[in-house]
Amino acid sequence: MKQHIKVIIPAYNEADSIAKVINDIPSIVNEIIVVSNNSTDNTEVNATKAGATVLQEPRKGYGYACLKGMKYIANQKIKPEIIVFLDGDYSDFPEQLIELITPIIEENIDFVLGARVKEKREKGSMTPQQIFGNWLATYLMKILFKSSFKDLGPFRAIKYDKLIALKMEDKTYGWTIEMQLKALKQKFSYLEIPVKYRNRIGTSKVSGTLKGTILAGIKILNWIFKYSFK
């Protein structure tokens, strides 16, 4: 049976990259939803020209943008079977979406994460603080939750009904870790697929600044320790 698939792309000032991301998404996808997170450049214009549905979320925060996309889908008559989350900076390879959704379709896996493994990462595509933060977070998840996750990457696919069951709430930097921790707690079946990763177009709004890195790190650790006591 053909699956109904939607992609949600949070985007903040990604005018130079957003069309490339959209154009590389496989045609199997039914709808591409770009959520402009208060962008001040031509992100919205370029996304519209490339064929995406464009939503506006004035409240800054990765989670706010993702939740906006989910609310839009919830209000539609026809619900998808699979939701894919993808960043708008062209650091991921959108064509690998097929590799992420295949285990869901063929093996009935609930949640598939694109893992940015060292062997497939372009040099410099992840900052030292990102690499260390990923290692620390996934190590703590292994110790506290017996998790086998190796990454917190944003490129991920999940069954729509499972996503709704997670009752996602984080508004900012903790969105990805929240999803993984809740999936573990609810005993979802999950899988990591190694994905390629390249240097993004433009400057990162999180890992590209000291403030963003610190805030993201604090939020991630907060989620881990919050769930370790539940």
Where are each of the predicted segments found?
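Conserved donor nucleotide-binding strand/loop of the catalytic core
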Residues: 44-76
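Short loop->beta transition adjacent to catalytic acidic/histidine clusters or analogous donor-positioning motifs
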Residues: 2-5, 26-34, 81
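Acceptor/aglycone-binding surface of glycosyltransferases and processive sugar-polymer synthases
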Residues: 58-60, 64-71, 94-173, 200-211, ...
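Hydrophobic helical membrane-anchoring modules
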Residues: 1-2, 16, 146, 168-230
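Short, well-formed alpha-helical segments that are part of the catalytic scaffolds
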Residues: 12-28
